[in-house]
């Protein structure tokens, strides 16, 4: 086998050829390599070749440094051939193991031997030894510890300066993750100062103590210790230092006293523990030693590993006991979930109380103290309401009742409350948008964001998901309930408001900007929420908190809702709490003069509008802000007032047919699945006819004459945004949801075909009702007949009953006949309409055929004229 020097000369020769060829421009591409070197580096022995050459290079460099010759290494491996992952290069003191097949640094002979002789190697008076120097780098405790990447300052010169000139350094083996380095050196034992290794170490320790050199901003100076054993130099990625050493005895077992005396010089020991009290026959005994500092465990392992002690007839093998890692944590969770899960729950609670709650309280207070700003609003000039001044005055005095602002959609209730909140401190606006808050988690997240509750419970949900992934048995352990989350959020908000209440003026008549909490669209969101159980929990929590806050005088609470029954829901809660006050403000449409001013402002002076057009707008749209805005956009786009109103009314009719009568595919109660109407079509049609005749109809009239006492159907119809309540002269009246819908009702009634068709349904439904009543009367008469069939004389009481039933029978029969006559008239009218439609269709067909015939005649005439012209041209040419 060729020696390293001969292999080196061969490598240098090939490298010089490559270098000369490159200089002569023979190699123009850097990817082209000489065949000899390509063959050499393509073999599987490339790692060993580079390792041997680098080792030889290190020897030469060290000798040059010890000889104080300032020169570069005489050969460098080209970076072109270096691999990303370098091959393992054994330390210099292990080279003689390969050559002599035994360790001359540390003897592992179990026959005994001289300690001094076992810690040195060499021939004659030249001896070798190894020292461990600590505090050179920051100790790496995990793969995520990147501190060592910032400390690549060379330390070779500093270490060389700490060694005497007559002590030669052979190599320096850096151990970055252990924070130190091995230094392999030689000394002359014939020197009187270096007769023994102890004298050498005494001089080195005194030099290190005098110099007190700090490496890489270390808090302590570097120290050196003699290596007695055979160091285990490794580059395993997942093995890191720790404070605990696991010691394996190869041979006899050492007592705790001997272990303590042997290892105490390297650092303070916290505990010594043996694996089992009785020696095991199956394998070697083990001991665990825990040091107070990690430097002590590192020094002990690096100095005493694989050391043979003849007095104890044993060798010590040491390894680090790894710290608790993520996989160990997962194992603990999987094995002991009943202990670890409650423990983590307690830690999470403590973290919440000590860290999260103060942060949340700070952010809520910051959100509450910031003034509200909504930007410029275009409708500020035209929409001036008396309710605005009333609310501003009410909110500047101590709270004593919940405020309910009820108004249909598009009536401007949000813009009204925005004006009240503009530039006002101590204000929170909670927007319960139905499109965002489809379930309880989305609502709680949105609610937390609006009041400034941060960190929110979404962080807990993420943490719980991670735990669920780690622990299969811990499913749902870290997911708090909806009730708990709402109670926690509202309780913390109440604490912030209670602290604010300490700053209130003593005189209750003194104006002050008291805290104001506005909740917009809450009841609509509750109705649209998927889980009704959780929706009820959220509604109960919020309303109970609102009642408590107002009764304590901490804050004004305002609910904005388009639901006509929202006030009744809060009244039920107040009655259950023993009473309370609720101030209800019913907002209607704005005055016609304000509506005209808004239209003029929106369309601008360039779009003319007549007085007749203004009257049409007021009659059909009233003062509904949303509809006025749509009309102004259509007028700006170029539509006339009549055309825009016609399109809007037609669209409203389509919406009523779809939502009210279910005359669309999406509301069709079919097998595919659709929403079933909570009222009957005849009930809605009769209501529409009454409202089209009179804009306002008594609630009781509809309840008893149209819905026949079915209050749930009437209330569902009102909640569907087709109808609405309005108090007129202290009487509850029912009208269309908007003036536009009222115009749509009138158009539907004026549509004869639709009117007759719906009236047919109404008459059939009424006939069925009369028939069911008639059937009951007939059954009763049969029972009376059976009672009197066996006697000659009819009792007076039974006779009166029979006469009453006969009168009812006649009345029902008369009603049925009347409605049947109406149906006959309707059927004749429908037949007439069908005939008219057929006649119109035939006329249209004849007109089309006539126009087609005329077009054909014109084409023939044109062809004849063209032929005549061609003939005349031919004759003229002849």
UniProtKB/Swiss-Prot annotation:
Coiled coil region boundaries: 761-873
Mitochondrial matrix side: 1-338
Membrane-related topology note: Single-pass membrane protein
GO cellular component: mitochondrial inner membrane
TM helices/strands, residue ranges: 339-359
Region (Disordered): 99-120
Mitochondrial intermembrane compartment spans: 360-878
RRM domain mapped to chain residues: 229-323
InterPro entries per the UniProt record, alphabetical: Mt_escape_2_C, P-loop_NTPase, RBD_domain_sf, Yme2_C, Yme2_RRM
GO molecular function, one term: RNA binding
Source superkingdom: Eukaryota
Keyword Protease appears in the UniProt entry: no
Subcellular location(s) per record: Mitochondrion inner membrane
Keywords on record: Coiled coil, Membrane, Mitochondrion, Mitochondrion inner membrane, mRNA processing, RNA-binding, Transmembrane, Transmembrane helix
A GO BP annotation: mitochondrial genome maintenance
Cross-referenced Pfam families: RNA12
Physiological role: Plays a role in maintaining the mitochondrial genome. May have a dispensable role in early maturation of pre-rRNA.
Family listed: Belongs to the YME2 family.
Protein name as catalogued: Mitochondrial escape protein 2 homolog
Organism, as annotated: Dictyostelium discoideum
């Amino acid at each position: 086998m060729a020696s390293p020097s001969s292999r080196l000369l061969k490598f240098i020769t090939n490298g010089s050829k490559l270098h000369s060829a490159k200089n002569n421009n023979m190699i123009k591409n850097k990817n082209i390599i000489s065949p000899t070197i390509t063959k050499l580096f393509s073999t599987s022995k490339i790692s060993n070749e580079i390792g041997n050459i680098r080792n030889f290079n290190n020897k030469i460099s060290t000798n040059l440094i010890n000889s104080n010759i300032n020169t570069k290494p005489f050969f460098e491996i080209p970076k072109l051939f270096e691999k990303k992952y370098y091959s393992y290069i054994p330390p210099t003191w292990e080279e003689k193991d390969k050559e002599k097949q035994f360790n001359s640094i540390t003897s592992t002979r179990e026959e005994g031997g001289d300690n001094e002789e076992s810690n040195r190697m060499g021939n004659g008076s030249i001896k070798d030894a190894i020292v461990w120097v600590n505090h050179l780098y920051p100790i790496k405790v995990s793969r995520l510890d990147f501190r060592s990447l910032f400390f690549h300052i060379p330390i070779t010169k500093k270490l060389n300066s700490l060694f005497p000139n007559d002590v030669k350094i052979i190599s320096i083996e850096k151990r970055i993750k252990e924070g130190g380095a091995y230094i392999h050196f030689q000394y002359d034992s014939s020197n009187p100062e270096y007769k023994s290794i102890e004298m050498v170490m005494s001089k080195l320790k005194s030099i290190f103590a005098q110099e007190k050199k700090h490496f890489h901003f270390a808090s302590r100076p570097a120290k050196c210790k003699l290596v007695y054993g055979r160091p285990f130099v490794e580059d395993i990625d997942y093995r890191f230092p720790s404070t605990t050493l696991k010691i394996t005895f190869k041979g006899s077992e050492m007592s705790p006293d001997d272990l303590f005396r042997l290892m105490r010089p390297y650092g303070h020991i916290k505990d010594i523990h043996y694996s089992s009290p009785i020696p095991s026959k199956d394998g070697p005994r083990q001991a665990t030693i825990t040091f107070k500092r990690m430097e002590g465990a590192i020094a002990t392992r690096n100095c005493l590993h694989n050391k043979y002690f003849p007095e104890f007839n044993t060798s010590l093998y040491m390894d680090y006991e790894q710290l608790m890692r993520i996989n160990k944590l997962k194992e603990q969770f999987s094995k002991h979930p009943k202990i670890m899960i409650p423990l983590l729950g307690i830690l999470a609670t403590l973290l919440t109380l000590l860290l999260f709650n103060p942060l949340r309280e700070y952010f809520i207070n910051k959100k509450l103290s910031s003034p509200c700003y909504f930007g410029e609003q275009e409708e500020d000039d035209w929409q001036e309401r008396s309710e605005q001044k009333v609310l501003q005055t009410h909110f500047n005095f101590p709270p004593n009742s919940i405020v309910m602002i009820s108004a249909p959609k598009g009536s401007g209730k949000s813009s009204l409350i925005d004006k009240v909140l503009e530039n006002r401190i101590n204000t929170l606006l909670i927007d319960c948008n139905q499109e965002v808050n489809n379930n309880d988690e989305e609502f709680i997240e949105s609610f937390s964001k609006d009041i400034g509750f941060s960190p929110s419970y979404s962080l807990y949900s993420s943490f719980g998901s991670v735990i669920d992934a780690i622990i299969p048995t811990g499913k749902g352990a870290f997911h708090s309930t909806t009730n708990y989350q709402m109670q926690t959020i509202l309780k913390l908000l109440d604490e912030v408001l209670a602290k604010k209440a300490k700053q209130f003026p003593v005189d209750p008549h003194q104006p002050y900007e008291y805290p104001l909490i506005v909740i917009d669209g809450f009841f609509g969101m509750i109705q649209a929420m998927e889980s009704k159980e959780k929706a009820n929990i959220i509604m109960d929590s919020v309303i109970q908190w609102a009642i408590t806050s107002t009764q304590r005088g901490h804050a004004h609470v305002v609910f904005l809702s388009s639901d006509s029954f929202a006030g009744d829901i809060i009244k039920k809660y107040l009655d259950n709490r023993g009473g309370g006050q609720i101030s209800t403000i019913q907002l209607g449409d704005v005055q016609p003069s304000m509506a005209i001013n808004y239209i003029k402002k929106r369309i601008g002076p360039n779009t003319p509008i007549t007085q007749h057009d203004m009257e049409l707008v007021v009659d059909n749209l009233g003062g509904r802000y949303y509809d006025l805005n749509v009309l102004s956009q259509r007028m700006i786009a170029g539509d006339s007032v009549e055309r825009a109103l016609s399109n809007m009314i037609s669209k409203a009719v389509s919406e009523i047919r779809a939502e009210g009568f279910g005359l669309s595919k999406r509301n069709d109660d079919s097998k595919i699945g659709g929403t079933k109407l909570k009222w009957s079509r005849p009930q809605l049609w009769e209501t529409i006819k009454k409202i089209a005749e009179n804009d306002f109809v008594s609630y009781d009239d509809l309840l008893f004459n149209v819905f026949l006492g079915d209050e749930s159907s009437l209330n569902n119809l009102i909640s569907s945004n087709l109808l609405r309540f309005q108090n007129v002269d202290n009487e509850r009246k029912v009208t269309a949801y908007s003036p536009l819908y009222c115009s749509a009702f009138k158009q539907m009634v004026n549509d004869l075909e639709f009117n007759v068709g719906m009236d047919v349904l109404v008459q059939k439904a009424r006939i069925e009702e009369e028939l069911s009543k008639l059937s009951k009367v007939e059954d009763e008469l049969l029972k009376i007949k059976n009672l009197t069939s066996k006697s000659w004389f009819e009792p007076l009481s039974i006779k009166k009953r029979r006469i009453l039933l006969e009168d009812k029978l006649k009345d029902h029969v008369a009603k049925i006949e009347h409605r049947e006559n109406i149906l006959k008239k309707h059927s004749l009218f429908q037949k007439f309409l069908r005939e008219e439609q057929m006649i119109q269709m035939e006329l249209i067909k004849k007109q089309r055929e006539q126009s087609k015939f005329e077009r054909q005649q014109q084409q023939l005439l044109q062809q004849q004229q063209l032929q005549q012209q061609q003939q005349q041209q031919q004759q003229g040419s002849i």
